[in-house]
């Protein structure tokens, strides 16, 4: 199995808009001073995906070359529930997962990021096992060793969502890692909401030590940079601009500097759009 190596330089970007064409997300990234971006490759709130045409692939790959952006991340749709107890939703999810991964391979995207799932009326244990089956069924797509890694995003712990604890993510990874390239995308707002105190350097030291012990730092492949509107452990997923929430700017400067996290691709999902992202990228690159 081919495992995508880490980048050779720090990469920083944001979730940019693919309005008017997937390639436009790359050009918006270039315009805000990014070196990588995250995007939706299809409407994130619909089951039906538009078919990827050769023209779309060509436009995207030309934009990749022209912008010199790398380690692009696709964020899978919000309707997906890899651990859904409802058989119809589970089957729809698996079809979408297959299409999403296939499109990412065609486009030359490096990461495809999924929310692990929600148990809803069922137990989390059963949800975790169904999610493992869902991701395992994607193995045939990786037979030709594409340079793509599937990422499980940390969640805030609201409702019946799985993936808010490192232990749950470790369980998923242990069940998947032999079949597909798998890793974790750590969302700073989400883990803070789930009770991991990253508001200080000392806090980060404890969290990274715990992550390494439970999952292994080699599985940490990317970071979503978001401050948090709500306080520690509230299980509420509300992003704030960098330095304007309950986590604080020192936490993000730590991520930019520490040898364990400095080279991990980082993607802003903060509210405010391109004007704010330009300022945040400049701040994180120059001030931190």
Swiss-Prot record:
Its cofactor is Zn(2+). Keywords: DNA damage, DNA repair, Endonuclease, Hydrolase, Metal-binding, Nuclease, Zinc. Binds 3 Zn(2+) ions. Zn(2+) 1 binds at residues 75, 115, 153. Zn(2+) 2 binds at residues 153, 187, 224, 269. InterPro entries: AP_endonuc_2, AP_endonuc_F2_Zn_BS, Xyl_isomerase-like_sf, Xyl_isomerase-like_TIM-brl. Zn(2+) 3 binds at residues 190, 237, 239. The keyword Iron does not apply. It is an enzyme of class 3 (hydrolase). Pfam families: AP_endonuc_2. NCBIfam families: nfo, PRK01060.1-2. HAMAP family: Nfo. Endonuclease IV plays a role in DNA repair. It cleaves phosphodiester bonds at apurinic or apyrimidinic (AP) sites, generating a 3'-hydroxyl group and a 5'-terminal sugar phosphate. Belongs to the AP endonuclease 2 family. This is Probable endonuclease 4. It comes from Chlamydia trachomatis serovar L2 (strain ATCC VR-902B / DSM 19102 / 434/Bu).
């Amino acid at each position: 199995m081919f495992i995508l190596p880490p980048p050779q330089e720090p990469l920083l970007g944001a979730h940019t808009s693919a309005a008017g064409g997937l390639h436009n997300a790359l050009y918006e990234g270039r315009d805000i001073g990014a070196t990588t971006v995250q995007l939706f490759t299809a409407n994130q709130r619909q089951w039906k995906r538009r078919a990827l045409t050769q023209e779309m692939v060509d436009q995207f790959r030309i934009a990749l070359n022209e912008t010199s952006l790398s380690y692009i991340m696709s964020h899978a749709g919000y309707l997906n529930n890899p651990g859904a107890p409802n058989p119809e939703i589970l089957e729809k999810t698996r079809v979408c997962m297959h299409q999403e991964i296939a499109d990412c391979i065609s486009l030359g995207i490096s990461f495809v990021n999924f929310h692990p799932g929600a148990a809803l009326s069922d137990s989390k244990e059963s949800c975790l096992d169904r999610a493992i089956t869902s991701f395992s069924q994607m193995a045939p797509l990786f037979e030709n060793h594409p340079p793509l890694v599937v990422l499980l995003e940390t969640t805030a712990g609201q409702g019946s969502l799985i993936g808010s604890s490192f232990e749950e993510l470790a369980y998923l990874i242990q069940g998947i890692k032999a079949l597909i390239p798998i890793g974790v995308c750590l969302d700073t707002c989400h883990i803070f909401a789930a009770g991991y105190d990253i508001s200080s350097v000392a806090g980060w030291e404890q969290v990274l030590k715990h992550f390494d012990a439970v999952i292994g730092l080699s599985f940490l492949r990317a970071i979503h940079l978001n401050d948090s509107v709500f306080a520690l452990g509230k299980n509420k997923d509300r992003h704030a601009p960098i330095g304007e929430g309950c986590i604080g700017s020192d936490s993000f400067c730590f991520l930019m500097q520490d040898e364990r996290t400095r080279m991990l691709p980082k993607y802003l999902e903060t509210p405010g759009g391109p004007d704010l992202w330009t300022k945040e990228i400049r701040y994180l690159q120059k001030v931190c």
